[in-house]
A protein has these predicted regions:
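Metal-dependent polysaccharide deacetylase catalytic core of the NodB/CE4 family, i.e.
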Residues: 25-125, 146-153, 178-188
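C-terminal active-site subregion of NodB/CE4 polysaccharide deacetylases
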Residues: 1-17, 93, 97, 104-107, ...
Length: 221
């Protein structure tokens, strides 16, 4: 058996389609959210575009996130997507914990997961986050053996969902028993081919009799 998990950052509008596809294939997913960057009742539909696609990632309205992510795991990505090692350590941790508290209150369940904004972390922030009650911190580094982490606050994934080595990384991960991929749903923008490629990954993984979908938090429990 191989445990497979995925996570998606930032609470953007394209997450709606990710959720739909995950439900279609009974796939689990964790969504890393920034509560402080959402409007209360209106979606954010204007702003910086993703690369040269003309696609605006946007943000879900806060009053819809509970229904959109119903049945899925959520994790802290900080209230305001601050960068560890750039802002004061205590301010960074306070921001991360504030998001944790908001998510726990809003979703009515424990939230001990974290994804490092920009993939940045320091030994000091790892220790402080651990003391603050976080169970793991996802980085943007890759490893062939996710399960053999030395510090769960520096939890590396197997690959990014759009990397050309996706299936090679999956096969390399089989001996370890864990395959973990991540991304941003806006990276698929409105491109049918990219969405089809993602759906094909979900289908192939879900049809593999050796695959068991899990949440990221399950890797460190």
């Amino acid at each position: 058996m191989i445990k497979v998990c995925q996570c998606w950052d930032d609470g953007v509008l394209n997450d709606i389609k990710v959720v739909e596809l995950c439900r279609k294939y009974n796939a689990k997913a964790t969504f890393n959210l920034n509560p402080g960057l959402h409007n209360a009742v209106e979606r954010i539909t204007e702003g910086k575009t993703y690369l040269d696609t003309g696609h605006v990632p946007g943000k879900l309205a806060w009053n819809e996130v509970k229904s959109v992510y119903e049945g899925f795991e959520v994790a802290s990505h900080g209230m305001n997507h601050l960068s560890a090692g750039v802002v004061d350590d205590k301010a960074f941790v306070a921001d991360a914990v504030a998001a944790k508290n908001v998510l726990e209150d809003h979703f009515g369940r424990e939230c001990r997961g974290f994804a490092w904004p920009y993939g940045r972390y320091t030994d000091e922030t790892c220790q402080l986050m651990r003391e603050a009650g976080f169970a793991y911190g996802r980085t943007t580094l890759y490893t062939e053996d996710v399960a053999s982490y030395t510090d769960p606050m520096q939890l590396h994934s197997s690959t990014h969902f759009q990397r050309g080595d996706f299936w090679a990384a999956f096969e390399k991960a089989r001996p370890s028993g864990v395959f973990y991929f991540w991304g941003h749903s806006y990276e698929m923008a409105d491109d049918p081919a990219l969405w089809q490629a993602y759906e094909d990954k979900l289908r192939r993984l879900s049809e593999d009799p050796e695959v068991e979908w899990v949440n990221v938090i399950d890797l460190v429990k």
